[in-house]
């Protein structure tokens, strides 16, 4: 705008000179007034060299710097929100002359990196360059029609769900629904998911998702062990289970000291009396459909629990496992409208009986009531979980796959029971038509057993047939040299079946078509296995079958939930930073979304190139030598990292090294993961400054020198401080024969400033859903890849179907086993982290760490006169997060962290992390992506709440009946005919002036947690039952 104004003035002067020659040419040459500031031009009198005459009056030399010609759509300035001017002002407010002086005072010099430089993308790609690069990678992936099956299927993702959930930041930037009052939308959707699972499996309890089918089966195996109180130590897996599931269970069994036996069903032997459980597949991995009724009766007669891995689409027409007698049912909801994505993310499930509900892993959504007596939803039975029970938890799982569970639930809502049955019958019909056609051809032999969607074929040369299919861009599953399976799905067409006939004809003419023989095909499902029980009878599954209706339902639920679209979510240790649109775009491109994880790797060269680049970049960032991308959650990464350490000790003959030292301040997943590895846990305390007590650690390490396996440590600490003694801590562990496992939860304060490898760690998992921008999705997906030093690289996990290992690959390989169902975990979301790292460049990503630290210190400074800041470093600064101490307020005003969090909802904010790592506190993490204005708004809200608390302390307002205890205040409460509160409706609703311009409203009053657990309901209830319960509690 300014440049245009100056050029216009220059034009007017030229025009005036034409009419008034008395104006001198030197008047036109005053750069300070009329020439663009982009020009280095200097003009003085008649000494100007004239390269070009301007209308005969004077002359001007204009040059443009090369810098000015570079693309302008750079990314770091879009991600890192504080401007250079704001950075200086904020640093000065904290007490430092500039940002770098603050960083120098905060990060210990002993571990500080001089600099970090990428080997690729060091300057950072612009957003348009990044999109072009990802399009180039996508072009290297080949999309073949998949008939591989094995738990992964093509699916038609309804576009209304794709656009309005998977691509919608209103859904994918939400956090796990800890604050139920501003999460009722996704809680309802997850309750829909649980209801869908319980209806289809025929069992009354389901969780709200697990990571994948293989790990869900391993969790079920652990449940069987717990149900039997650890007294029976053998678990039998039927050979008809998916190979990846078998390997995951074998790997997981080591930590529980379980013996896993793989056997044909006919050879199962319970005579030892030592079998805690069995796992079977329904339908089997090669398609066979068996009636397990008598098998299950026999298992139960021998005191053995039965786990059944099943397929949701098949269960729409097959007798449900619960009716067959199964105790636990697991599986994947992937084929309910979630792309294969080269392996994930997908929502798995686990269903069981009421009897075992408290042994279930994962999050469970339950129905409760709010303070007004109206029905409300919440996460139920949280006392089972790792953040409370630590090493005694049912599982280490926390982040699961909520976003994908929501997609699958909406798929069920959209199609309804009749729509799902139609899809299942069509898939079964296509498989039946294919089988009939092969019998008619006579070139191969078709299995005699009944099937649902997968046909098993015996042939002379399976490789030759697979190669013929390859020519038609079709992938088949080669079981062995004489066996092929062909799995059908909802995207298969009748034309595909005709093409398959040509493939299997082996040169013989095909004299019929699929359409011509289809009328002759009979149902292949035995009458005893045909489903008769109705399912999805609740109105929600029977009223949103047009796109308009589903769109409005999705939008209605979204409007109930606070996300990053509305305000910052300052949860400590959660790193709720920007999930940029450019990062998210490739996730839904078909070239990334529609590849089967077991497709030949030559069909996924774009993925493979990205994996290599990402592995190299993560090695640079962390100081490690190799990475595994297989762990598909942070907790899975912890488990994998500890198992790598155990494999290393075992390879050296140190089988006895099983002691793991963990600070009391560690996240609950740390002891839970160590327990899953069969480790003996020893805790060490912290000193008054929140640092690990080094002398106590030294004594513990020396006392267990012969048996020490590892230390688990988070850096910066969970107290939000860079511990000065971290290098000494690592040395103590190494001197006593142990390895250092670093929890990567706080990596956002390390990148570019220090690194786990530089500090002295041997292995570390990265939460890509924290530091590296994968969105939290309302409770998943996540990714937890692990980086290791060279000596641990040979032990990184592999896979039974597609062998994998470290990136870069080590010289030798002795993999520990299999951690996740897919070779590269949730590969579909890796482009998010990859694009973030590549666009930021080494300097931009380093600045992100610096600004995250600046923002935290700025907020701590603003709040310190109102709330005590619990821990600081040696120079009085905090890391990227800090802890506000509310403990004194319980005595002076009866206020606890939950009360402050609920009142923050009235101000339009999600509360910080409550009562962890210190009970009675709030932990705040702003991230680098929040603007100074947003930081100030949040600080203003907390300061205003402190003033409200002061009114309680002074006795001005009632100790128990006040605006904080009454929070949050939803519209229905504020608009009620009767108002009995001792404060005004206006003050309850609008405690800050900015709220009148825009306010996010909670949709329920404070939810009663105790009622929900005492009256556990985890599925949709008939509407009238909700009304009756509300009346009963009113």
Curated annotation (Swiss-Prot):
Gene3D superfamilies: Aspartate Aminotransferase, domain 1, Type I PLP-dependent aspartate aminotransferase-like (Major domain). The modification N6-(pyridoxal phosphate)lysine is found at residue 770. It is an enzyme of class 1 (oxidoreductase). It is found in: Mitochondrion. InterPro entries: GcvP, GDC-P_C, GDC-P_N, GDC_P, PyrdxlP-dep_Trfase, PyrdxlP-dep_Trfase_major, PyrdxlP-dep_Trfase_small. Its EC number is 1.4.4.2. GO terms for molecular function: glycine binding; glycine dehydrogenase (decarboxylating) activity; pyridoxal phosphate binding. Keywords: Mitochondrion, Oxidoreductase, Pyridoxal phosphate, Transit peptide. Its main location: mitochondrion. One of its GO terms (biological process) is glycine decarboxylation via glycine cleavage system. Its cofactor is pyridoxal 5'-phosphate. HAMAP family: GcvP. Belongs to the GcvP family. This is Glycine dehydrogenase (decarboxylating), mitochondrial. It comes from Flaveria trinervia.
């Amino acid at each position: 705008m300014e440049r245009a104004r100056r050029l216009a003035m220059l034009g007017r002067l030229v025009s005036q000179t034409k009419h008034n020659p008395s104006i001198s040419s030197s008047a036109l040459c005053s750069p300070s007034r009329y020439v663009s500031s982009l020009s280095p031009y200097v003009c003085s009198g008649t000494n100007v060299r004239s390269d070009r005459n301007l209308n005969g009056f004077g002359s001007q030399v204009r040059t443009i710097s090369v810098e000015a010609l570079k693309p302008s759509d750079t990314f770091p300035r879009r991600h890192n929100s504080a401007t250079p001017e704001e950075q200086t002002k904020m640093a000065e407010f904290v007490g430092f002359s500039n940002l770098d002086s603050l960083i120098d005072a905060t990060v210990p010099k002993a571990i500080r990196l001089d600099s970090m430089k990428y080997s690729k993308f060091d300057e950072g790609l612009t957003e348009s360059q990044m999109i072009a690069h990802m399009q180039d990678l996508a072009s290297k992936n080949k999309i073949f029609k998949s008939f591989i099956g094995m738990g992964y299927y093509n699916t038609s993702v309804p576009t209304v769900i794709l656009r309005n959930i998977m691509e919608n930041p209103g859904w994918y930037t939400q956090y796990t629904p800890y604050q139920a009052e501003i999460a009722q939308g996704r809680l309802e959707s997850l309750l829909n998911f649980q209801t869908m699972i319980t209806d289809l499996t025929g069992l009354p309890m389901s969780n709200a998702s697990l990571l994948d089918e293989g790990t869900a089966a391993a969790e079920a195996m652990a449940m069987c062990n717990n149900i039997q109180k650890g007294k029976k130590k053998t678990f039998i897996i039927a050979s008809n289970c998916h190979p990846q599931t078998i390997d995951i269970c074998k790997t997981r069994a080591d930590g529980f000291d379980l013996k896993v036996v793989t056997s044909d069903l006919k050879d199962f032997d319970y005579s030892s009396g030592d079998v805690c459980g069995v796992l079977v597949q329904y339908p089997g991995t090669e398609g066979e459909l068996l009636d397990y009724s008598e098998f299950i009766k026999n298992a139960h007669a021998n005191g053995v629990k039965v786990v059944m891995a099943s397929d949701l689409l098949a269960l729409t027409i097959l007798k449900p496992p619960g009716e067959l007698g199964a105790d636990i049912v697991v599986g994947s909801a992937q084929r309910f409208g979630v792309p294969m994505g080269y392996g994930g993310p997908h929502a798995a499930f686990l269903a069981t009986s009421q009897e075992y509900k408290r042994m279930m892993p994962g999050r469970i959504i339950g129905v409760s009531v709010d303070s007004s007596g109206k029905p409300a939803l919440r996460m139920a039975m949280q006392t089972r979980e790792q953040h409370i029970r630590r090493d005694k938890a049912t599982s280490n799982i926390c982040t699961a796959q909520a976003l994908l569970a929501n997609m699958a639930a909406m798929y069920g809502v959209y199609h309804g029971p009749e729509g799902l049955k139609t899809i299942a019958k069509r898939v079964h019909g296509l498989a039946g038509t294919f089988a009939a056609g092969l019998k008619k051809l006579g070139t191969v032999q078709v299995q005699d057993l009944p099937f649902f969607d997968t046909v098993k074929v015996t042939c002379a040369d399976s490789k030759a047939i697979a190669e013929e299919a390859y020519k038609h861009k079709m992938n088949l599953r080669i079981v062995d040299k004489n066996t092929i399976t062909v799995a059908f799905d909802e995207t298969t067409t009748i034309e595909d079946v005709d093409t398959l006939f040509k493939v299997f004809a082996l040169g013989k003419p095909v004299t019929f078509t699929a359409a011509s023989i289809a009328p002759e095909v009979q149902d292949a499902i035995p009458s005893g296995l045909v489903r008769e029980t109705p399912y999805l009878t609740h109105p929600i599954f029977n009223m949103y079958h047009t796109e308009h209706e589903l769109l409005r339902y999705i939008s209605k639920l979204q409007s109930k939930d606070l996300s990053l679209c509305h305000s910052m979510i300052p949860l400590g240790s959660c790193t709720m930073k920007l999930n940029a649109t450019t990062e998210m775009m490739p996730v839904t491109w078909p070239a990334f979304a529609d590849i089967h994880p077991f497709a030949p790797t030559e069909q996924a060269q774009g993925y493979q190139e990205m994996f290599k680049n990402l592995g190299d970049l993560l090695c640079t960032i962390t100081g490690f030598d190799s990475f595994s991308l297989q762990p598909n959650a942070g907790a899975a990464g912890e488990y994998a990292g500890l198992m790598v350490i155990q494999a290393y000790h075992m390879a050296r003959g140190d089988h006895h090294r099983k002691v793991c030292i963990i600070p009391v301040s560690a996240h609950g997943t740390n002891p839970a993961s160590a327990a899953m590895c069969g480790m003996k846990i020893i805790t060490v305390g912290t000193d008054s400054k929140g640092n690990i007590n080094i002398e106590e650690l030294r004594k513990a390490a020396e006392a267990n020198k012969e048996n020490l396996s590892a230390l688990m440590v988070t850096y910066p600490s969970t107290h939000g401080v860079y511990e000065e003694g971290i290098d000494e801590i690592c040395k103590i562990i190494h001197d006593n024969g142990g390895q250092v496992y670093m929890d990567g939860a706080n990596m956002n304060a390390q990148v570019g400033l220090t690194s786990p490898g530089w500090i002295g760690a041997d292995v570390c998992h990265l939460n890509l859903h924290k530091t590296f921008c994968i969105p939290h999705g309302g409770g998943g997906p996540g990714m937890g890849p692990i980086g290791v030093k060279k000596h641990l690289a040979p032990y990184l996990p592999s896979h039974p179907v597609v062998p994998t290992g470290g990136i870069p690959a080590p010289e030798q390989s002795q993999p520990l086993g299999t951690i996740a169902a897919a070779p590269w975990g949730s590969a579909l979301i890796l482009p998010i982290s990859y694009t973030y790292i590549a666009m930021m460049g080494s300097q931009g990503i380093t600045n992100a760490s610096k600004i995250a630290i600046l923002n935290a210190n700025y907020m701590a400074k603003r709040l310190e006169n109102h709330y005590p800041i619990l821990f600081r470093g040696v120079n009085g600064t905090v890391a990227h997060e800090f802890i506000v101490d509310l403990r004194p307020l319980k005595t002076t005003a009866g206020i606890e962290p939950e009360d402050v969090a609920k009142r923050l909802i009235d101000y339009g904010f999600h509360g910080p992390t409550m009562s962890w790592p210190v009970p009675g506190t709030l932990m705040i993490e702003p991230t680098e992506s929040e603007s100074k204005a947003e930081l100030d708004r949040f600080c203003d809200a907390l300061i205003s709440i402190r003033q409200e608390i002061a009114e309680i302390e002074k006795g001005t307002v009632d100790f128990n009946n006040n605006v904080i205890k009454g929070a949050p205040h939803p519209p229905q409460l504020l608009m009620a005919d009767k108002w009995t509160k001792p404060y005004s409706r206006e003050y309850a609703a609008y405690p800050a002036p900015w709220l009148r311009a825009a306010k996010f409203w909670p949709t329920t009053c404070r939810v009663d947690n105790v009622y929900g657990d005492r009256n556990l309901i985890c599925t949709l209830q008939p509407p009238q039952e909700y009304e009756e319960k509300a009346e009963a509690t009113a």
